[in-house]
Amino acid sequence: MSQDSTIPNSNYHTMVVLGDAAWTLLANQPIDQIDIDAVADRACVDRGLAGAIAGSVQYLVLAKMSELDRQSLTEAYGDIQDAGEVSVREKIIEGLLHWFETYAPYRLQIDQLNRSARSHPDLALRLLVSLEAFIRRTLVMSGDPAFGLRGMMRVKGVAGVFLATACIWMKDDSNGLAATMKMLDQRMLQAEEWGISLRVFDVRRSHDGLNDRV
């Protein structure tokens, strides 16, 4: 191929610019209709290099989401540290809310992924794995190690809270995502009640939340 391409100095930087390009294209077309060559051209990266480093558009999109997940968790952690002593439940809510805030400018991309996942089981599975990894990190950051069978069930329970809240978030144009926050709080309370009845969450809870598991 003959084109004026700028090859970044490192593979990491190449991945970043390719991921940004794929993410931008995803706003306007389904992921399975985005060609890796089009991503490379938009990123001004050699097509062969893009194929060698990334391999697929799906890989680039998931890598971009992983970057955004890290950003949201890092910001949530900073806010939690500034807030002082708060309960595990409040920390989890803060972590989830930061995700919704971080992705708020990218609802078009999330909508495209949701639509594509319905007809592409491989994408749906990878998105679910990515979500559960994010939830697990949120729990660990909040003081819940999420180990063992009960830990796995807590991850899935909070993932259910997340998915239910996401339906509201997609349409939420309220100031400060107030509708999303309200739904998130309601769903977390409901999940906590179910979890305690099923012995998934710790029943030993104090008013200050230090023994909360959700």
Residue ranges and their predicted role:
Residues M1-H13, R204-V214:
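N-terminal intrinsically disordered/low-complexity leader segments
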Residues S2, V17, L25-A63, E67:
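Helix-turn-helix
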Residues N11, M15-W23:
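Short, leucine-enriched amphipathic alpha-helices that occur as contiguous helical runs
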Residues R42-V45, L60, Q71, E75-K91, ...:
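Amphipathic alpha-helical hairpins
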Residues A63, Y77-Q112, V129:
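Hydrophobic alpha-helical connector segments
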Residues Q112-S119:
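Short linear capping/connector segments at secondary-structure termini
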Residues P121-D144, M152-A164:
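Amphipathic alpha-helical packing segments from all-alpha helical-bundle domains
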Residues D144-S206:
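Hydrophobic/aromatic-rich alpha-helical bundle segments in the mid-to-C-terminal region
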